[in-house]
Amino acid sequence: MKEPFGFLNLIKPPGMTSHDLVDEARKVFGIKRIGHGGTLDPGASGVLPLAVGRATKLFEYLQESVKLYRGEITFGISTTSHDAQGDILEKKEASWITKEKIEEIIPLFIGEVQQIPPQVSAIHFKGKRSYEWTRKGVKVDLEPRNVRIENIVIKKFMEGEFPKVILDVKSSPGMYMRALARDLGEKLETGAFLSFLVRLESGPFKIEDAYTLEEVKEKALQEELGAVLLKGDRVLSHIPKISISEQQKTLLFRANRLPLDTEPGKNLIQLYDEEEELIALGTIKGEKRPYYFQPVKIFD
C-alpha cells in the first residue's frame, strides 16, 4: 500500500497539545512519519498544519508562512504564563481603559519589533526548554527576538472592571500572542493576559478549509483519507511547477538529474509526474544548453 503523502489542514481544539494531535493522526493514517508546523499552546485552538508521510520533507519551505491570529486580551490581570493557563500574579481595576487608548498604542507594536518570549515557552535556554526551568522554579532571562507584526485590527472592545479587546494579528513566525498581550498591558500599566486564542491562518492553511479530528476519523472509516490531504502544488503555490513524462521520471531517478529546456536560475522548481504527484524539488543548472534539473529533494 502506498504511503500517504500530503498536508492535512487540521483544527486543534483547546485542551490538547499540538503533539497530541500528531499522535492521533498517526493512529488514523497508520504511519509514524507525521509532523506539525507551528506549535499552538494547549489552551489555544485553530489551524495546525500536519505533514503526512514524505511531505515532512517540505516543512522547511513553509517556515516563513505568515500567521493570522484572533485573540482576546483581558486588561487588569497578569498571569505567570500570560494566558488563562497560568496562575494570577496581580489584579488591578482597569475600567478606565477605552478602545481609543488601545488604538493609541497599537502602532507601537506594528512592523519590526523586539519581543521577549514568555518564560513558559519552548525556547531553548542552557540545554533545556524555558518551560522546564520554570517548572523547577528557576527564572530565566530570555533574550529579546526580532519579530514582524504586519497588522493589528481591533474587532471588538468590551468595557468593564477588567476590559477586554479582541484583536486580529497578522505576523511572522515566532511571534507570541501571549507576549503581545503582556506588552500591551505593560504599556497601559495595568497588566494583561491572553484570555483565548484562535489561529485563523498559517500560510496557505485557512480555518474555513480545515478539518476537525472527528471529521478525519470519519473519512478514515469511509476509506476516503486521500480526500483530506492537500497536494504539494496547493501548499507550495509560490514555487513554479513543471510536469514531466513517465520516461523523464525514470531518467531522473536513475541519473539524479534531468535535461530540461528551461532557463537556469537559483529559484526552486517543483517537478510533477503524469499522475500530478510531486516527485522532486530542485533548480535548473548549466552554463549552456542542454540545461538540466538538479534535485535537492526527491520523493520516490
Regions found by a protein language model. Name each.
Residues 1-13, 17-36, 40, 44-47, ...:
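Accessory RNA 3′-end/elbow-binding domains used by RNA modification enzymes
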Residues 50:
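Phosphate-centric recognition/catalysis
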Residues 53-56, 78:
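Short, charged/polar surface micro-motifs in flexible loops or helix N-caps
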Residues 60-75, 140-154:
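Structural signature of FAD isoalloxazine-binding scaffolds in flavoprotein oxidoreductases
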Residues 61-114:
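Acidic, low-complexity central loop/insert segments
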Residues 121, 125-144:
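Extended alpha-helical targeting/anchoring segments
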Residues 122, 164-207:
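Pseudouridine synthase
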Residues 150-158, 283-285:
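Short amphipathic beta-strand and strand-loop transition segments with alternating hydrophobic
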